[in-house]
């Protein structure tokens, strides 16, 4: 048996202490981020493990760190991969209807919440384009429910808006995101889950420890993922922001992200989806025209199936 601790940004009492009390025959830990405040406790716990693995300097991304750690422990070179989740194919917990976009305006850290007015404006734009809009979040975030409603009302759009804040468990949230045309989220757990599900995802990112968790490195960023940020000279503050008056204010690096930045990121993902649907329709219309010319007696019927992302005929009747 082996006990491991491979997180870089960690707390000794919540991570290293567990390895210590496990009494495993072999213990391995990565070299963590150490500040002057945490140096003494980390020094003690690190002195108790059998092996320490240095996964790289700050701000090496956690995905890269995990693969370096696994490679060192196993003795094999394991190249980093984009996160992936295989999830059930179950209908989302909303009524069937038009395609929908999922918006996640919450976050455990109030300062990382992009302004609700921005989400409301985005919801209005998505509705104008024919998408339904589904708001999600934890039950603890229902305190902002009225504010969300008012922001949507101020944007002049209520039809096709579905508020699922506090109404889903984790599996249902995954069901919702798996079938979404797009997911837009603050830098929080559901954003990473959406990316791992393979859904088109836009993540609104601040600079507290930029590059450690988000954005993902290019080599492990899926083609249908966008990270939106507005770089500032105070990046890498570790969220100890000196520019806000209290802990409930939005971090300036989050507030500085413009609505059109987020919309452009959404467009870059939706455009590809819309173009694909248009090409499929064009292909189908031309195919049916050719069939009709070949069979003037009556309209032919063709069964279609998605194959490798393309609509193809499989049987003529």
Residue ranges and their predicted role:
Residues 1-317:
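Catalytic machinery of carbohydrate-active enzymes
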């Amino acid at each position: 048996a082996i006990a491991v601790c491979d997180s870089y940004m960690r707390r000794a009492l919540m991570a290293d202490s567990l390895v210590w009390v496990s009494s495993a025959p072999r213990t391995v830990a990565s070299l963590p981020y150490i500040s002057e405040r945490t140096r003494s406790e980390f020094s003690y716990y690190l002195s108790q493990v059998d092996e320490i693995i240095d996964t790289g300097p700050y701000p090496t991304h956690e995905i890269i760190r995990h693969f370096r750690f696994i490679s060192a422990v196993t003795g094999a070179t394991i190249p980093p991969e984009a996160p992936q989740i295989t999830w059930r194919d179950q209908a989302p917990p909303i009524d069937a209807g038009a395609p929908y976009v999922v918006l996640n305006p919450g976050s455990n850290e109030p300062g990382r919440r992009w302004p609700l007015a921005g989400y409301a404006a985005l919801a209005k734009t998505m509705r104008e384009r024919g998408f339904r809009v589904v708001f999600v979040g934890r039950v603890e975030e229902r305190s902002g429910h009225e504010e969300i409603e008012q922001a949507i009302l101020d944007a002049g759009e209520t039809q096709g808006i579905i508020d699922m804040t506090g109404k889903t468990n984790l599996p249902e949230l995954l069901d919702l995101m798996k079938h979404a045309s797009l997911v837009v989220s603050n830098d929080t757990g559901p954003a990473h889950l959406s990316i791992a599900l393979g859904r088109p995802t836009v993540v609104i990112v601040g600079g507290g420890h930029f590059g450690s968790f988000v954005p993902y490195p290019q080599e492990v960023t899926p083609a249908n993922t966008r990270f939106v940020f507005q770089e500032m000279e105070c990046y890498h503050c570790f969220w100890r922001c000196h520019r806000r008056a209290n802990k409930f204010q939005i971090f300036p690096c989050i507030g500085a992200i413009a609505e059109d930045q987020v919309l452009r990121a959404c467009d870059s993902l939706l455009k590809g989806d819309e173009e694909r649907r248009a090409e499929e329709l064009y292909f189908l219309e031309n195919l049916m025209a050719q069939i009709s010319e070949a069979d003037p007696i009556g309209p032919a019927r063709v069964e279609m199936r998605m194959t490798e992302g393309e609509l193809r005929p499989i049987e003529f009747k």
